[in-house]
């Protein structure tokens, strides 16, 4: 029913295999609930004029909360994932996770109020977090870039304020889902996302299924060992790859050239490298080499058709992506494309809306099944 365009009762009878009286009763129930719009009768093709109906994508709403170390993106959307309102707020500082999450939940409720959406019509919220997420438990197990956020019952804290279903997921996983839905990985059922910022992480989709792993740590490539010489080295909580190839490592390789504007320093580095700055060139080559090796390793294990590069490292950074591609080409045996993110910072938001819409549809489907059961067995 939620396909674009109209449908008729006759089509519902044919597709569902249910009787005309059952479909009539269920359709009437859905129209009364506002899930479906009654558009009256359509043109006749020779017989009775058909009753036209349309799924009401604004019968209820979904939302997403993409929590970052400094900024949090909020969005409200309809049941097809079409964004209605979007806002960026500061991630609370100097408070514990309970207070911080409650504050962000209040920000989302304020956004709903400004959009004139009643709280009771919010069916599902997806919350993305930068760290290890226990998906089944709805817990943020560890978030190195959020001080003090460890073993946080995110789902329960947010649900207590929002009073709706909350789904919690790792932000890089959401980014991959977003790119697969509306970005650079569209049409690729086996793909991966490599995120490089202050932290490093990856997400993997195989045959359309997002991988979480036994400990919900699939894609935690920050700890990938980049060579035998690093086996006995202590990298603390950051991990080998993150220490060698994260933004802090790149800044350390080009310390004198980092401008004050954080949005400009990657383009400044690449421009310096193009202009012949030897230190900038080495910084790009060494960093791209590490990321390229890690990307090739992912390709060898996962066999994707495409790997998407995202995060602050790759914003406005096609030359850096080219350097990564050069390394991957020398190492890969199973060819795959390496592309830049199309959605950028909005990728986790898009993925979160996809997750929230899926949960909302699950709820609506359950309600529909109950309605059908009541109609079949009054």
Regions found by a protein language model. Give the residues of each.
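ATP-binding/phosphotransfer module of carbohydrate and carboxylate kinases, centering on a glycine-rich
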Residues: 1-41, 45-121, 161, 228-232, ...
């Amino acid at each position: 029913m939620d396909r674009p365009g109209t449908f008729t009762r006759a089509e519902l009878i044919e597709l569902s295999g249910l009787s005309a009286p059952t479909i009539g009763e269920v359709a009437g129930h859905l129209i009364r609930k506002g899930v479906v719009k009654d558009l009256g009768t359509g043109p006749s093709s020779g017989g009775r004029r058909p009753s036209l109906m349309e799924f009401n994508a604004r019968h209820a709403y979904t939302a997403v909360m993409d929590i970052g170390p400094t900024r949090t993106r909020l969005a409200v959307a309809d049941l097809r994932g079409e964004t209605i309102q979007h806002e960026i707020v500061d991630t609370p500082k100097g408070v514990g996770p309970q207070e911080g999450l409650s504050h962000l939940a209040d920000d989302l409720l304020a956004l709903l109020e400004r959009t004139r959406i009643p709280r009771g019509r919010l069916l599902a919220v997806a919350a993305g977090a930068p760290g290890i997420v226990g998906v089944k438990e709805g817990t943020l197990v560890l978030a190195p870039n959020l001080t003090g956020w460890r073993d946080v019952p995110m789902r329960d804290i947010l649900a207590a304020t929002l009073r709706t279903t909350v789904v919690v997921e790792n932000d890089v996983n959401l980014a991959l889902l977003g790119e697969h839905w509306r970005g650079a990985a569209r049409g690729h059922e086996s793909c991966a996302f490599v995120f490089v910022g202050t932290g490093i992480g990856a997400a993997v989709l195989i045959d359309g299924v997002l991988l979480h792993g036994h400990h919900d740590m699939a894609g935690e490539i920050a700890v990938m060992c980049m060579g035998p010489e690093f086996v006995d080295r202590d990298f603390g909580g950051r991990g080998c790859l993150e220490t060698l190839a994260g933004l802090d490592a790149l800044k350390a390789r080009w310390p004198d050239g980092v401008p004050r504007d954080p949005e400009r320093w990657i383009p400044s580095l690449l421009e310096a490298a193009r202009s012949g700055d030897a230190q900038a060139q080495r910084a790009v080559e060494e960093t791209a080499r590490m990321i390229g090796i890690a990307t090739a390793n992912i390709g060898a294990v996962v066999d994707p058709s495409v790997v998407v590069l995202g995060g602050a490292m790759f914003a406005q950074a096609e030359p850096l992506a080219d350097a990564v591609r050069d390394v991957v080409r020398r190492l890969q045996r199973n060819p795959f494309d390496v592309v830049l993110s199309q959605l950028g910072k909005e990728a986790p938001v898009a993925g979160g809306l996809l997750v929230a819409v899926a949960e909302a549809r699950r709820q609506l489907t359950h309600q529909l099944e109950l309605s059908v059961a009541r109609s079949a067995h009054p």
